[in-house]
C-alpha cells in the first residue's frame, strides 16, 4: 500500500475528479478561511479510504482516487498505518508536505526484530486529531516469527495507539508475553469506579443517557485485508434509538430527588447486567486457511442479538480475540480488538499449537469469553542458518563446519554450501550438498581468500542463504622487500613508493608497514603506515629535518624482515618577514640611517640576502624601488628631498624562498627653516589688562609650511617671556598692567627649525579699574554694634569713585549693605554670638576692582533666651523616681538658646519659693503637699547673666496611696483557706476604685501573686493539710500602689477519714455472724481505728459493739427472725494532739439470722432484695440527680431568654 498526503497553503485551481461524486467536500474548499490548508489524499488501486461527510454519514472511496480535504487548523490529520508499514512527513522544494506510508524496510531492524509490531508510526504533535478523519482505533497487531531465545521479551517495542473506546490502549504480542499486562483482568470484575463516577454524574444529568454505555462509535477498523469497513450501526447512537440499551432509557425530570438517583443507579446496574448476559452468549470462533505463519479466524455475533428490539443489542461495537501458546489453560493475551467478524492472524510460529477465544465488548461492558478453539500451524522451510565457521586450514585445503538452524516442524534433510572459487564478484557455485554439518575443500591455492554461504533444506523447501564469510588458506612469509624510494619531499611531507616482494603472486594479499625514525637520538623505528597500497605520503613532519624509513611486508602467515633504511630530508620553508625598519640616529633634511633585525623564523636555512625598498609615499608614486640588496642589516640614505615623506620596508631571500615584506616605516625628512616675520600689530584697541595681536606668514624658500609661531613679550623691567606658542596667526595676551608699555616680537617654526625674530612692536595698555582692596577691619562697640573700616587700594589711571561693602552670615548669603565714598560703616541689630562675614570692592570710571579677601567675625555672647516649653511628666516609671507622685512632681523642659554662652543653671519659681538646679532638662520637685496645685515658671542662667522667665504652668500633686488592710482567715479546711480583709461596706472609696493584690510565700521565701481584684475575700485551694502558709496584701488606687502589709500566717486543718462502703455480713454456725469492712491506710503517720454500730429490730438508735483497728468482728447470741443493721466508720487518732477525728458512717447493711432448712430460699430472697435495694438510689445519688435537674432547667431558661432578647 502506498498512500500520499499532500498539504498546500492555497486552494488548487484544478482538482482531480472524485470517484462517483460521493464525497461532498467542496463546501469546505469554497467557504474555508485563508489560513486553512487543502489536503490531497491519494488512494492507490485496490485500497479503500473512509471519511465522514459533512452530514455525519460515512463514505468509502475506492482507489485509484485523489481526495481533496480541508484542514481547518493547518495541521496534518493522523494517519494510522497497518502492520509492517511506516509513515514519514516529507516536504519538497515547493513547500508541499507529503505523508508517505510505505512498507517497512527489513534493513532497519536487526535479526528477529519485531518490525510489524508498530501499527501507528509516531507522528508529530500537530498530527493528533482531525475532524474529517476517522481513527483506526482497533487494529490487529501481530509480532514476527523469530527464533525462541534470540531476543528477550523486554526488547519488543511498546507501540503507542490513538485513543480508543477503552481506558488504556494496548498492543499484545503473540509470544514473549510476560512483558505485557493482560486486559482480561480489567473486565473480570464489575466497574466499581465507573459506577461510582456515574452515580455522581446522574445528579447533574437531565435527559441524557449514560455517556459511556450509550455512546455511538464509528471508528474504522483495519482487520488485516488492507481495506476499511464501516463498523457499527447508526441506530446504536446515544439518543436511545435502535436496538441498543439506549432504547430502555426514558425522559427524566429536570429536578431529581435522592430517591430517584438511587433508582437510576439500580436501573443502570440492571442494564449493565443485561448487556453482559447478552455479550456472554458468543460462540467459539471458527479457524480456516491454516498456514505456517498465518490463520484466518471468524466468529458469529452473540446469540442474544436476535431476541427482538428491546431484548438485545442491534450490533456489538467491537470484539476482542485472546491467543495462548501455552495450552488450553495457559495465559491468554489480547491480540486483536475491532468491529469485524473476521481476523487474519499473521507472524505465527510454524508447527506450533495455539488456543484462541473471543470476547464481545459494548463500550465499557465486556462479556464472558467464548469456548477456546485450538489449531496447529503448518510446517515450512527452515530458518536462515548462521554463517559457516572455519575449523581448520592449510596451504591447499579449508575445513568448514556449521550448526543446524530451526527446522520449523520438518526435519532438515540436507545442506547446500556455495563458494566463489576465490574469484571476487564472479558469482557463487555449489561446492557441497549433503546432510553432514561439515565440509573439507582441497586443491586450493595458498594464501588465497574464498567466500562461502550456506542454506538448509527440508521436505517443505529451502531456507535463505546465510551471511557471506571469507576464509583464507595458508601461505609463505614474504621475502624482505627493497628499500622504499623517495618520490617527492615537501616542507612538512614526504611521498614514498615501493614494489611488491619477489616471489609473491598477484592474487596474494600483502600488507605493508612503513616505519619511521623521527629523532636522531632515538634509535627505534615507529610504524607510520599500514596498508596494501604501494605508495604513501607521510605528513605532519618537521621542515628541513632528516628522517629514516624502512619497509616490512606481511601476510596471513607472518612478517618479513625490515628492508634497508632510506634517509631523506624535508625541504626548508620560506623565512618569515624581517622586523620593521627603525630609525638609527637623527633625521636630516637630506637623509637618515635605518636598521632592521633578522626574522624570528628563518624557515630552517640561513638568510644570505636582504632587500630594502623605498617609496616617496605620494599617491602618484606607488611603486617600490630597491634601495639596498645585501647581507647587512642597516643602511644610510643620502641625497633625499627635504620635507618629503618616505616609506621603507624590508624582506629576505633564502633557499626556502622569498619572504613577505615587513611592515612599512614612514619617515619624513626635515624641512628648511622659515624666513623672518613682519612685526606684530594690534588688532582693535588695547585694553587695560590685555592686547590682541596678529601677524603675517613669513616668506620661505623651501616651500615648507609653517607649523607653529612663537610670540615673545618684554616687560618694563626688561624681563622677556614667551606669551604664545601655536599654529594661529593671532593671539591675545592677558594679565597686563593698565597704562604700561610692552614690547612684542614673533618668529616662525617648521620641520627645519625656528626662523629669526621679527622687529619689535611697542604697545601701551589702557587705564584699568582699581586694584584689590585689603581686608576690611572689624571692631565691636560697647553697645553691641560692629564698626567696619578699610583703606583705599591702588587705582591706575583714575580716581576711586565709591566703595561697596557686602555683609552676610556666610559667603552664599552676602548682601550689599553700604556703597559710597566713605572708608568706614557701622552695623547694628546683629544676633549675639553669631558668625558673620564681609568683603569690599572699589570702583572707578574704568570699572570695578576685584573683591577683597573674605573677613569672618563673631558677635559677643548675651544672656540666654526664655524657656519655650515647660511641662509636667504625668507617667514616669517608679524605678527612675522612687518618690511617691503624691509628694513630688517631675518637670521637663527644652533647653533654650544660650546666645553664645553655655547655660550653667536654671531658676524654678514655685510662687512662695525659688530653687536653682544645674544644667539639666529634667528635675523632680520633692517634699510637696498631696493634692495641691502649684504655679511654676523657669529661667536659664549663663556667664553673661539671667534670661527672662518662661510662662506659668499649673501642676497638681496626686493624693496619697491607700494603706494595706488587715488580713484574716475566715475559714480553714484540710486543702483550703478562706481569707478576708478590709470592710466591704466602707464608703471611703467608690465601688471598683480599690484593687487588692494578695501574695503567697513559696518554699524559696519568695512572694508570688495569687489574686488581684476588687473583692474582699479569696479562697486559696489545693493546699496541704495541717501546713502553715504566709500571706501579705497590698491596696492600690488611682493615687498609686500602697505599701505591703505585714506577713500573716495561717494553717490548714487535718482531714477526717473517708466514708467506708457498707460492711459485709456472713452468718456463722450457731446464733452468730461475722462482719467485714474495707480498711483505710494510716493518714500522714496517724493510726486509723474503726467503730462498728448495730441497730436491732425496731430500735431507734445505733449501739456501738466494737472499736478497734481490726477490719472484722464476730457477734454471737443473735435472735432469729430479727432485723439487724450494721454500719462502720473510720477514726483518725492524731499523735501530736491526741485528738480523734471521726469520719462519716458507711451505709447500713441489713442482716437476719436464718434457719438452715430455708437457707436456699432465703438466699434467693436475699439476692432479690439485694437487687431491689441496689436499684434504689442512695442519698448522695438522689442529691446529684436533683442538682443535675436544676442545672438542665437553668440552661434551658437561659437559651429561651437569649432567644427572646435577640428577637
Curated annotation (Swiss-Prot):
<feature type="modified residue" description="Phosphoserine">
    <location>
        <position position="396"/>
    </location>
</feature>
<dbReference type="GO" id="GO:0060510">
    <property type="term" value="P:type II pneumocyte differentiation"/>
</dbReference>
<feature type="compositionally biased region" description="Gly residues">
    <location>
        <begin position="230"/>
        <end position="246"/>
    </location>
</feature>
<dbReference type="GO" id="GO:0016020">
    <property type="term" value="C:membrane"/>
</dbReference>
<feature type="modified residue" description="Phosphoserine">
    <location>
        <position position="261"/>
    </location>
</feature>
<feature type="domain" description="Fibronectin type-III 6">
    <location>
        <begin position="769"/>
        <end position="862"/>
    </location>
</feature>
<feature type="region of interest" description="Disordered">
    <location>
        <begin position="184"/>
        <end position="213"/>
    </location>
</feature>
<dbReference type="GO" id="GO:0048146">
    <property type="term" value="P:positive regulation of fibroblast proliferation"/>
</dbReference>
<dbReference type="InterPro" id="IPR003961">
    <property type="entry name" value="FN3_dom"/>
</dbReference>
<feature type="transmembrane region" description="Helical">
    <location>
        <begin position="1185"/>
        <end position="1205"/>
    </location>
</feature>
<feature type="domain" description="Fibronectin type-III 8">
    <location>
        <begin position="961"/>
        <end position="1055"/>
    </location>
</feature>
<dbReference type="InterPro" id="IPR013783">
    <property type="entry name" value="Ig-like_fold"/>
</dbReference>
<dbReference type="GO" id="GO:0010761">
    <property type="term" value="P:fibroblast migration"/>
</dbReference>
<feature type="domain" description="Fibronectin type-III 7">
    <location>
        <begin position="874"/>
        <end position="960"/>
    </location>
</feature>
<feature type="region of interest" description="Disordered">
    <location>
        <begin position="230"/>
        <end position="265"/>
    </location>
</feature>
<dbReference type="GO" id="GO:0045600">
    <property type="term" value="P:positive regulation of fat cell differentiation"/>
</dbReference>
<comment type="function">
    <text>May be positive regulator of adipogenesis.</text>
</comment>
<protein>
    <recommendedName>
        <fullName>Fibronectin type III domain-containing protein 3B</fullName>
    </recommendedName>
</protein>
<comment type="similarity">
    <text>Belongs to the FNDC3 family.</text>
</comment>
<keyword id="KW-0812">Transmembrane</keyword>
<keyword id="KW-0597">Phosphoprotein</keyword>
<dbReference type="GO" id="GO:0034446">
    <property type="term" value="P:substrate adhesion-dependent cell spreading"/>
</dbReference>
<feature type="domain" description="Fibronectin type-III 9">
    <location>
        <begin position="1059"/>
        <end position="1156"/>
    </location>
</feature>
<keyword id="KW-1133">Transmembrane helix</keyword>
<keyword id="KW-0677">Repeat</keyword>
<feature type="domain" description="Fibronectin type-III 5">
    <location>
        <begin position="676"/>
        <end position="768"/>
    </location>
</feature>
<dbReference type="Pfam" id="PF00041">
    <property type="entry name" value="fn3"/>
</dbReference>
<feature type="domain" description="Fibronectin type-III 2">
    <location>
        <begin position="384"/>
        <end position="476"/>
    </location>
</feature>
<keyword id="KW-0472">Membrane</keyword>
<feature type="domain" description="Fibronectin type-III 1">
    <location>
        <begin position="281"/>
        <end position="380"/>
    </location>
</feature>
<dbReference type="InterPro" id="IPR050617">
    <property type="entry name" value="E3_ligase_FN3/SPRY"/>
</dbReference>
<feature type="domain" description="Fibronectin type-III 3">
    <location>
        <begin position="480"/>
        <end position="573"/>
    </location>
</feature>
<dbReference type="InterPro" id="IPR036116">
    <property type="entry name" value="FN3_sf"/>
</dbReference>
<dbReference type="GO" id="GO:0005783">
    <property type="term" value="C:endoplasmic reticulum"/>
</dbReference>
<dbReference type="GO" id="GO:0045668">
    <property type="term" value="P:negative regulation of osteoblast differentiation"/>
</dbReference>
<feature type="domain" description="Fibronectin type-III 4">
    <location>
        <begin position="577"/>
        <end position="672"/>
    </location>
</feature>
<feature type="modified residue" description="Phosphoserine">
    <location>
        <position position="208"/>
    </location>
</feature>
Amino acid at each position: 500500500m502506498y498512500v500520499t498526503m499532500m498539504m498546500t497553503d492555497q486552494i488548487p485551481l484544478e482538482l482531480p475528479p472524485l470517484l462517483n461524486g460521493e464525497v461532498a467536500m467542496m463546501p469546505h474548499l469554497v467557504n474555508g478561511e485563508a489560513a486553512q490548508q487543502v489536503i490531497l489524499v491519494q488512494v492507490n488501486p485496490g485500497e479503500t479510504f473512509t471519511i465522514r461527510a459533512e452530514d455525519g454519514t460515512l463514505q468509502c472511496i475506492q482507489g485509484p482516487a485523489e481526495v481533496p480535504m480541508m484542514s481547518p487548523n493547518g495541521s496534518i490529520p493522523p494517519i494510522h498505518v497497518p502492520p509492517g508499514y511506516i509513515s514519514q512527513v516529507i516536504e519538497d522544494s515547493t513547500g508541499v508536505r507529503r505523508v508517505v506510508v510505505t512498507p517497512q524496510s527489513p534493513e532497519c531492524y536487526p535479526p528477529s526484530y519485531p518490525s510489524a509490531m508498530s501499527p501507528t508510526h509516531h507522528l508529530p504533535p500537530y498530527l493528533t486529531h482531525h475532524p474529517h478523519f476517522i481513527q483506526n482505533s482497533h487494529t490487529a497487531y501481530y509480532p514476527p516469527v523469530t527464533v525462541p531465545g534470540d531476543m528477550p521479551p523486554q526488547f519488543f517495542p511498546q507501540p503507542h495507539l490513538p485513543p480508543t473506546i477503552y481506558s488504556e490502549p494496548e498492543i499484545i504480542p503473540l509470544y514473549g508475553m510476560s512483558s505485557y499486562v493482560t486486559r482480561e483482568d480489567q473486565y473480570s470484575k464489575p466497574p466499581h469506579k465507573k459506577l461510582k463516577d456515574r452515580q455522581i454524574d446522574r445528579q447533574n444529568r437531565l435527559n441524557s443517557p449514560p455517556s459511556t454505555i450509550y455512546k455511538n462509535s464509528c471508528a474504522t477498523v483495519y482487520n488485516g485485508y488492507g481495506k476499511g469497513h464501516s463498523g457499527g450501526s447508526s441506530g446504536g447512537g446515544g439518543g436511545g434509538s435502535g436496538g441498543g440499551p439506549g432504547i430502555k432509557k426514558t425522559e427524566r425530570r429536570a429536578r431529581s430527588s435522592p430517591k430517584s438517583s438511587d433508582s437510576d443507579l439500580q436501573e443502570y446496574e440492571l442494564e449493565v447486567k443485561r448487556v453482559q448476559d447478552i455479550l456472554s452468549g458468543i460462540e467459539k470462533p471458527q479457524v480456516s486457511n491454516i498456514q505456517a505463519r498465518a490463520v484466518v479466524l471468524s466468529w458469529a455475533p452473540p446469540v442474544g442479538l436476535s431476541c427482538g428490539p428491546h431484548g438485545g443489542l442491534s450490533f456489538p461495537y467491537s470484539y476482542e480475540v485472546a491467543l495462548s501458546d501455552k495450552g488450553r489453560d495457559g495465559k491468554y493475551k489480547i491480540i486483536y480488538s475491532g468491529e469485524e467478524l473476521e481476523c487474519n492472524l499473521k507472524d505465527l510460529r510454524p508447527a506450533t499449537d495455539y488456543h484462541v477465544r473471543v470476547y464481545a465488548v459494548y463500550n465499557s461492558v465486556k462479556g464472558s469469553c467464548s469456548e477456546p478453539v485450538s489449531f496447529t500451524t503448518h510446517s515450512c522451510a527452515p530458518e536462515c542458518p548462521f554463517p559457516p565457521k572455519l575449523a581448520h586450514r592449510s596451504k591447499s585445503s579449508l575445513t568448514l563446519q556449521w550448526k543446524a538452524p530451526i527446522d520449523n516442524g520438518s526435519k532438515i534433510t540436507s545442506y547446500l554450501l556455495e563458494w566463489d572459487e576465490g574469484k571476487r564478484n564472479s558469482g557463487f557455485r555449489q561446492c557441497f550438498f549433503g546432510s553432514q554439518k561439515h565440509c573439507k575443500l582441497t586443491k586450493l591455492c595458498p594464501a588465497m581468500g574464498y567466500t562461502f554461504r550456506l542454506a538448509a533444506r527440508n521436505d517443505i523447501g529451502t531456507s535463505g542463504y546465510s551471511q557471506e564469510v571469507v576464509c583464507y588458506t595458508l601461505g609463505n612469509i614474504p621475502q624482505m622487500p627493497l628499500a622504499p624510494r623517495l618520490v617527492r619531499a615537501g616542507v612538512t611531507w614526504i611521498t614514498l613508493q615501493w614494489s611488491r616482494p619477489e616471489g609473491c603472486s598477484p592474487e596474494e594479499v600483502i600488507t605493508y608497514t612503513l616505519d619511521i625514525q623521527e629523532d636522531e637520538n632515538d634509535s627505534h623505528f615507529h610504524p607510520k603506515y599500514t596498508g596494501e597500497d604501494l605508495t604513501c605520503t607521510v605528513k605532519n613532519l618537521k621542515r628541513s629535518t632528516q628522517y629514516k624509513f624502512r619497509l616490512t611486508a606481511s601476510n596471513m602467515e607472518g612478517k618479513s624482515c625490515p628492508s634497508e633504511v632510506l634517509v631523506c630530508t624535508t625541504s626548508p620553508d620560506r623565512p618569515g618577514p624581517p622586523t620593521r625598519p627603525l630609525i638609527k640616529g637623527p633625521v636630516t633634511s637630506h637623509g637618515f640611517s635605518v636598521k632592521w633585525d633578522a626574522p624570528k623564523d628563518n624557515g630552517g636555512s640561513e638568510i644570505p640576502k636582504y632587500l630594502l625598498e623605498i617609496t616617496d609615499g605620494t599617491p602618484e608614486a606607488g611603486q617600490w624601488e630597491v634601495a639596498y640588496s645585501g647581507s647587512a642589516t642597516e643602511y644610510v640614505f643620502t641625497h633625499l628631498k627635504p620635507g618629503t615623506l618616505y616609506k621603507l620596508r624590508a624582506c629576505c631571500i633564502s633557499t626556502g624562498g622569498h619572504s613577505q615584506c615587513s611592515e612599512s616605516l614612514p619617515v619624513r625628512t626635515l624641512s628648511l627653516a622659515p624666513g623672518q616675520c613682519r612685526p606684530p600689530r594690534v588688532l582693535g584697541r588695547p585694553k587695560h589688562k590685555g592686547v590682541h595681536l596678529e601677524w603675517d606668514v613669513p616668506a620661505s624658500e623651501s616651500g615648507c609650511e609653517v607649523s607653529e609661531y612663537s610670540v615673545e613679550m618684554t616687560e618694563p623691567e626688561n624681563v622677556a617671556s614667551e606669551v604664545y606658542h601655536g599654529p594661529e596667526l593671532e593671539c591675545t595676551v592677558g594679565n597686563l598692567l593698565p597704562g604700561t608699555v610692552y614690547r612684542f616680537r614673533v618668529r616662525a617654526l617648521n620641520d627645519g627649525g625656528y626662523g629669526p625674530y621679527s622687529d619689535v612692536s611697542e604697545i601701551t595698555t589702557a587705564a584699568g579699574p582699581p586694584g584689590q582692596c585689603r581686608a576690611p577691619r572689624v571692631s565691636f562697640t560697647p553697645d553691641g554694634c560692629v564698626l567696619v573700616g578699610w583703606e583705599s587700594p591702588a587705582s591706575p589711571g583714575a580716581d576711586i569713585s565709591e566703595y561697596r561693602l557686602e555683609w552676610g552670615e556666610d559667603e552664599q548669603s552676602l548682601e550689599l549693605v553700604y556703597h559710597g565714598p566713605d572708608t568706614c560703616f557701622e552695623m547694628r541689630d546683629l544676633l549675639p554670638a553669631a558668625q558673620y562675614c564681609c568683603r569690599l570692592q572699589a570702583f572707578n570710571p574704568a570699572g570695578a576692582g576685584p573683591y577683597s579677601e573674605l573677613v569672618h567675625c563673631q558677635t559677643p555672647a548675651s544672656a540666654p533666651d526664655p524657656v519655650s516649653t515647660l511641662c509636667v511628666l504625668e507617667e514616669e516609671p517608679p524605678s527612675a523616681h522612687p518618690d511617691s507622685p503624691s509628694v513630688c512632681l517631675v518637670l521637663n523642659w527644652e533647653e533654650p538658646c544660650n546666645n553664645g554662652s553655655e547655660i550653667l543653671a536654671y531658676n524654678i519659681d514655685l510662687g512662695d519659693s525659688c530653687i536653682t538646679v544645674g544644667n539639666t532638662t529634667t528635675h523632680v520637685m520633692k517634699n510637696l503637699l498631696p493634692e495641691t496645685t502649684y504655679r511654676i515658671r523657669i529661667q536659664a542662667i549663663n556667664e553673661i547673666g539671667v534670661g527672662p522667665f518662661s510662662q506659668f504652668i499649673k501642676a497638681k500633686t496626686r493624693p496619697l496611696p491607700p494603706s494595706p488592710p488587715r488580713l484574716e482567715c475566715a475559714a480553714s479546711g484540710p486543702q483550703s483557706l478562706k481569707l478576708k480583709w478590709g470592710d466591704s461596706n466602707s464608703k471611703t472609696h467608690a465601688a471598683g476604685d480599690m484593687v487588692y493584690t494578695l501574695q503567697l510565700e513559696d518554699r524559696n521565701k519568695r512572694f508570688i501573686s495569687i489574686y488581684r481584684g476588687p473583692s474582699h475575700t479569696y479562697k486559696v485551694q489545693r493546699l496541704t493539710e495541717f501546713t502553715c502558709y504566709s500571706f501579705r496584701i497590698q491596696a492600690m488606687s488611682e493615687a498609686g500602689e500602697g505599701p505591703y502589709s505585714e506577713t500573716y500566717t495561717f494553717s490548714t486543718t487535718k482531714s477526717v477519714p473517708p466514708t467506708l462502703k457498707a460492711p459485709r455480713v456472713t452468718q456463722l454456725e450457731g446464733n452468730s455472724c461475722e462482719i467485714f469492712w474495707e480498711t483505710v491506710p494510716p493518714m500522714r503517720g496517724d493510726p486509723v481505728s474503726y467503730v462498728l454500730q448495730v441497730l436491732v429490730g425496731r430500735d431507734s438508735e445505733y449501739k456501738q459493739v466494737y472499736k478497734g483497728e481490726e477490719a472484722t468482728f464476730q457477734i454471737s447470741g443473735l435472735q432469729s427472725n430479727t432485723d439487724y443493721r450494721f454500719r462502720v466508720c473510720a477514726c483518725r487518732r492524731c499523735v501530736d494532739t491526741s485528738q480523734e477525728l471521726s469520719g462519716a458512717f458507711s451505709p447500713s447493711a441489713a442482716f437476719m439470722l436464718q434457719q438452715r432448712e430455708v437457707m436456699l430460699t432465703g438466699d434467693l430472697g436475699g439476692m432479690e432484695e439485694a437487687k431491689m435495694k441496689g436499684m434504689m438510689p442512695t442519698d448522695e445519688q438522689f442529691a446529684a440527680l436533683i442538682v443535675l435537674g436544676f442545672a438542665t432547667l437553668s440552661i434551658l431558661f437561659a437559651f429561651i431568654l437569649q432567644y427572646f432578647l435577640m428577637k
